[in-house]
């Protein structure tokens, strides 16, 4: 009897994967291995998802089913931020099965890939980002959420075997807006539907994500108090300037001129030097390397002191390691491999054709009570050397949220660890963690804005624990 059940299970899995293998979006494995000079035996899909009912908005996606037992593992949607930056950064630089060697166009296998424990879906969002296309015009946090839910529904309608599996959304940076707004759409979508027709959303894992109105909104941009506090605490600005900033922090919020602008400009100069100095400082990892790669037709931001302007005329964030992305994703052969349509523009890491993007001044903070009420677990992870969406801001709003919602502390602030490289050594400190009712705050020591890039092993450890709903030690 047990052998018969086992046989049926294997038959069921084989049938499901055979259905997938017939899908038109399946990437040619031999050609992928040839072009990328790798040896990957898993399935890869690349194509387009309908992001509106008319089908005029088409979002490019890549999907990596887990190579082993995919139907026994959860599905994770990964979104990068911007707004307007491609999620293929996540696939090829951070947590995909093969990633670029630092500063090169060469792939290497990622032993800490999230495909070890999950089925990974990457969607380029919103319109004009990466290979995605559609009607151009004003976009907003709200319209992006609508597009994303439509694309997600289309994905599960096509990959029906995965719809019943536990579903999680993860990402970083401005995905701190994308993820809660999409979760809100999923909650509304699921309302009144039978269990078989719902999206099985279980949790959100947001890295260095914009959340509070005081972080990434237009109102917060002129005087970035959380960034300035981060620089002050890390001795990147003088004590004299830091004290001046603290003295006026409340009156300078949202102020673009006068003494507030003078102080903001002083931070820029003390941290990065003047434009004449041409000092390249990496705000995404304050102790990290600053790469410079600007392909033809692209521009790199020269704003190094904090989060780049949302409407800045650039498609490459400062110091970003993008050589491999541009080398491959602008190749005609790779476009053919990934089944990229002629409607898709030349790929860029961040879109300069996004158009007018309207940022919600409320951020995504206002959605957290609804999400937690619907028993969707939240992991807020933060690299502690990121100056773009720094830990100072995250701890500010997490503390505020806990007090407002009276979230019980389940386990207090404490260190967490990863295994040592040598058996003779002790477990290694990976950061700090605090568990509240429905919400976990986790820091990653010496990681920047892109945690899975900077700390791959640590990312695998904490993500597996979150998926399994396990406490950290």
Which residues make up each language-model segment?
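Terminal and linker regions of secretory-pathway proteins
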Residues: 2-473
């Amino acid at each position: 009897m047990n052998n018969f059940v086992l046989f049926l299970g294997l038959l069921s899995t084989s049938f499901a994967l055979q259905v997938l293998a017939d899908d038109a979006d399946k990437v040619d494995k031999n050609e992928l291995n040839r072009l990328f000079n790798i040896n990957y035996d898993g399935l890869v899909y690349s194509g387009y998802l309908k992001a509106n009912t008319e089908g005029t908005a088409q979002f490019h996606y890549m999907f990596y089913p887990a190579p082993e037992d995919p139907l026994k593992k959860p599905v994770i949607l990964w979104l990068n931020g911007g707004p307007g930056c491609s999620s293929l950064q996540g696939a090829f630089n951070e947590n995909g099965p093969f990633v670029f060697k630092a500063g090169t166009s060469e792939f290497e296998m990622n032993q800490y890939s999230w495909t070890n424990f999950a089925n990974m879906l990457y969607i380029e969002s919103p319109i004009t980002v990466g290979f995605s296309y559609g009607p151009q015009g004003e976009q907003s946090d709200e319209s992006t959420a609508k597009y994303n839910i439509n694309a997600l529904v289309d994905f599960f309608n096509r990959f029906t075997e995965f719809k019943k599996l536990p579903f999680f959304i993860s990402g970083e940076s401005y995905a701190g807006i994308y993820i809660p707004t999409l979760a809100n759409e999923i909650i509304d979508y699921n309302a009144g539907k039978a269990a078989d027709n719902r999206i099985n959303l279980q949790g959100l894992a947001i890295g260095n994500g914009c959340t509070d109105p005081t972080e990434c909104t237009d109102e917060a941009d002129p005087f970035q108090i959380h960034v300035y506090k981060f620089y002050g605490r890390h001795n990147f600005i003088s004590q004299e300037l830091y004290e001046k900033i603290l003295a006026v922090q409340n009156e300078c919020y949202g102020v673009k001129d006068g003494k507030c602008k003078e102080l903001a400009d002083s931070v820029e100069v003390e941290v990065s030097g003047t434009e004449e100095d041409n000092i390249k400082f990496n705000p995404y990892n304050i102790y990290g390397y600053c790469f410079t790669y600007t392909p033809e037709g692209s521009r790199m931001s020269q704003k190094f002191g904090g989060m780049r302007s949302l409407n800045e005329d650039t498609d490459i964030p400062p110091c970003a390691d993008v050589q491999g992305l541009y080398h491959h994703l602008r190749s005609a052969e790779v476009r053919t491999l990934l089944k990229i349509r002629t409607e898709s523009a030349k790929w860029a890491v961040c879109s300069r054709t996004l158009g007018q993007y309207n940022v919600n001044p409320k951020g995504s903070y206002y959605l957290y009570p609804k999400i937690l009420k619907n028993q969707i677990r939240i992991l807020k992870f933060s690299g502690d050397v990121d100056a773009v969406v720094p830990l100072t801001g995250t701890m500010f709003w997490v503390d505020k949220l806990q007090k407002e919602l009276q979230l019980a502390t389940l386990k207090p602030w404490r260190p967490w660890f990863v295994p040592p490289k040598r058996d003779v050594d002790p477990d290694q400190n990976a950061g700090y963690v605090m568990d509240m009712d429905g919400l976990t705050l986790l820091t990653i020591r010496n990681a920047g804005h892109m945690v899975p890039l900077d700390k791959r092993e640590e990312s695998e450890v904490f993500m597996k624990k979150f998926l399994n709903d396990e406490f950290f030690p």
